[in-house]
Each structure stands twice: as C-alpha cells, then as structure tokens.
Amino acid sequence: MNKIMNTMLKNNFIIPNYNNLNIVDLMRAIYCKYNIKTEINKNVETFKKLIPNNKHLLFILSDGTGSNLINKLNDDSILKRNKKDDIITVFPSTTACVLTSLVTAEFPEVHGIWGWFNYDRNLNINYCPLLFCDRKTETNLLDYGIEPKQVFLQHSLLNNLKTNVNVLFPKYIYDSVYSNFVINKESRHSYNDFNDIVNFIKKNCQNESESYTYLYLTDIDTLEHENGIDSKIVKDKLEEIENLIKKLCENKDLTIIFTADHGQTNITKDIILDFEEYDNMFYAYPSIDYGTASYYIKKGYEETFEKSFKKKYENDMILFKTEDLINNNFFGIGNFKSIAKDNLGEYISICKKERYLINNPNIEKYYGKIKGNHSGLSYDEMIIPLIIIDTNNDI
C-alpha cells in the first residue's frame, strides 16, 4: 500500500474508488433512459436495474443530506425505508463540484469546477462558480467580459434529454448564471415553499407525456453549516422533507430518486491560514473550499511552503502534492482534461476530523460561526444515500 493510501486510512478518510457505485454513474444511468449516449459500465447497469420504469421521474438533490443523516432517522421513516444503498459522491465533496458532475455526468477531472472557489489559469482570476463572480471584489464575471461558456466547459446534458424536462430551483437562485447553465429558461421553474413543489409535481404527473424533473433542495446544508449536523433545527427540517416526500408519493406512475451532493461533519476547531506568511508565495488565492484547499505556489517557494505548512498545521491538516492525488485517481477514473488539471494548484490540503480552514483574509466573517462543513474525505462527507421510491407500489 502506498504512502498516500496509508495516510488516508490512518485519518479515517474515504479513499475514493469510482469502481464502486457513485453519483456520476447514477446520473449516466438516468440520462440513458432519455437517449443520452454515455459510458456504460457495471455501475450504470446496476443503477438501471434499480430504477422503476414509470412515466415520470423526479430526481431530488437535497444539499448536505448525507447517509449519516438518513441512517439516524426512525426505522419507519419513508426515506430510510426506501434507501437502496450507500454510494459515494465525487471529491472534492463540495456543492459546485458535485452539482456540475450531476448535470454533465462527468467527474471533476473532466469538468474542472473544483469547489466554491475556483482559479482559472487562462483568465488569471479567482472566482466563485455558483455566484459567477470575482472572489475578491464580488464583481459579476460578465462585467469583465467573461462568458459562462469560458468557465463551464462541459455542457449540461439536461438540455438534450429526449423528454419533457423540468428543473425546480428555489426562487433566490432560479435566475442565476449557473442555473441558466444547468437548463434553459423555458424548462426552469422557481418555488417559494414546499407547497409550490407539491402543486407543481401534481400538475406535471397529470400530463400524458413522460417527464424528467430535477428538484434542488438547499435547506439542510445551510442549517448544518449554521447549527451542526445533530441540531434540532436540522432534524426538524428533515421531518418537513419527509412530509414533502409523503405528499409527492400521492402521485402515481412516478419514480422518486432522492440523494445528496455530499454530507457534512461537525466542526469543533477553526484553523486560520496564515496569509501574512504565505501571501508572497501565492500566485493565486487558495481554491476549492474550507475543508479541502488547493494552493498555487510560485516557482522557487515550493520547498519553503511545504516545510512551513507541515510544521504549522501538522495537527490539523494533511498536505499533499496535487500530482499524488491525481495519480491515485481521487478526482475521477484517470481521464484528466488538461484544462481541469491546469486550474488546480501545486498542493492540496485536507482538514482532519472536525477541523475547518479559514483560507480567507476576512477571518472575522467566519471565525466561530461554522458548526458543520464538508469538501473533505470523511465518511460523513463522502457517503450519500440512494433512495428510490416507486409510487405505484406500497411505500
């Protein structure tokens, strides 16, 4: 066993093995149903056998709702009762990365959207993909003359499905640049609350033509960040989602697939990145997220950075050379696109258990305020549920 794998096991990290059931192959299995030509492997075949062939398919992505939450529900929970398996998400386990894998059916090594923070080497800009803005100034990238197609290099497959496609987003993100990348405006719909969702699905299921609907739920992730994964407010919201699912199950000829982009883990210690020491070594801000970060180190500073970082943060983070993680297929199955690889830095750090890295000069904005987080390799972050409900059967 090589040194990288030893380090992972010693820290109870999940070693991503995409030969096992994973979210990318789940999406490939779903999109195959609608005449999308994509890679077929044993995982895709397994998923295809699990998915009922109903007229309507509702895919629900509940942000932050990892298997760790589902497993704690009562045994009579509709979500827990219908969980078919645990599957792995992609690494880094962060929303922008996973949502892009979801709509492109590609691993991060292909689409290159690495996390909440990205760095584009060609454009020489630190930016937030989901917000489509400059990380430092929050200026919309459109104001710089940067078009979405320059950032999102893989096309969303939702625009090509041979069926009636609907995408349901919360109203506050319904009209964002990223939402427009996901699906054209004609197929995109907003909701204010769960009643809007229930009414939309009921009406849609009355149509004679088949359909695919993608519903994105954001609440669990937000509440976990603010309160921790075991908080009452998270449990209460899960109960609301349970009730939503029960109402949706009143529609017949409907398949419901429920999963997450990632889970979260509780945070007990904040780690502050020493920008004062490292800023002169950086040629770009650290990217990805607050659990996993990528570092862009000027030539000639690599050894100094590595030695200092390992000494300063040895109890809180593990530093890897990016090339080592690439060679061990942490970001996919070994089909790295050069543009995706170029937008990673020379080093990547991963936080140890219950640690949270503030890799941002604005320390006061974050210090002590984050109770749950993700983007790392713990079980809680990487393992997500595969829940499948056939509303024609007893549930």
Where are these regions (language model features)?
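Feature captures the catalytic ectodomains and active-site-proximal regions of enzymes
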Residues: 1-395
